[in-house]
Amino acid sequence: MQAQGIRAPRTKGGITMIDVTRPELDDAITRAWQASPEGSAAAVYTPDIERVLQGLCANRFEAHYCADAAEARAYLNGKIDGKKVGIGDSETLRKLELHEALAAHNQVHNVLRSPINKGTTFFEYAKGTLLTDVFLCSVNALTEDGILVNMDGTGNRVAAALFGHEKVYYVAGVNKICPDLDHAIWRLRNIAAPRNCLRKHKATPCAKRGDRCYNCASPERICNGLLIEFKKMSNMDMEVVLVGECLGL
């Protein structure tokens, strides 16, 4: 059943989008990008959303565009029903309030929100996200030609995103879009990682100074592993839900 208040998506060349016009799309993306920390720089980079969606489809991902967080929440809440759902650590998903929406009609396994039984370690509990029907997370960056890039410290998020589910959903705001792979990796190290270290109160140079990556050797470093998904993984459905506003870090 279609969620109330959401327009029926249209499909074009394998891309599904809420029924918006190109001028509406361009205006939304420009406003969202300029409102983001990256977009506040003197030279404003405006991503080509149609190229991103086409690139994702060319790389075998399903691609869906939603104008804002409310539409994205309603879309995902309508798609995922009666499933065992794993949710990775994500400021984007917190902003969408997906845990609350999905928990009403799914069994949600959230490493940050679900209660952990006494005597169960985080390692043991986090392994549970590998065994769910559906897994949701965000991306640290994605390129205009549809490549997904993530960096992880513990590895549970990227491990869960790679294998073992019926479907994985990546949810990303337009602030995560980068022109190419070099810029995407730069964003991971100099924007996403310092902000996440600061959020998690890590004792790392990037968190203390808040400006860039220092390629440190701190035991609390969170950029230990880099995952680049050039194409969709085999034997599992993967969908990228792109949201036309600034979300996450």
Predicted segments with their positions:
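Short, Lys/Arg-enriched N-terminal segments with co-localized hydrophobic residues
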Residues: 3-16
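Conserved phosphate- and dinucleotide-binding cores of soluble alpha/beta proteins
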Residues: 130-249
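Flexible, glycine/proline-enriched loop segments at strand-loop-helix junctions
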Residues: 39-40, 62, 113-116, 168-175
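Short N-terminal helix-initiation segments at or just after the protein's N-terminus
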Residues: 23-32, 110-118, 186, 246-248
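Generic N-terminal amphipathic, Lys/Arg-enriched alpha-helix
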Residues: 20-62
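N-terminal active-site beta-alpha-beta segment that forms phosphate/nucleotide-binding
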Residues: 45, 49-126, 131-136
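Catalytic cofactor-binding cores of redox enzymes
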Residues: 28-34, 78-80, 158, 164-165
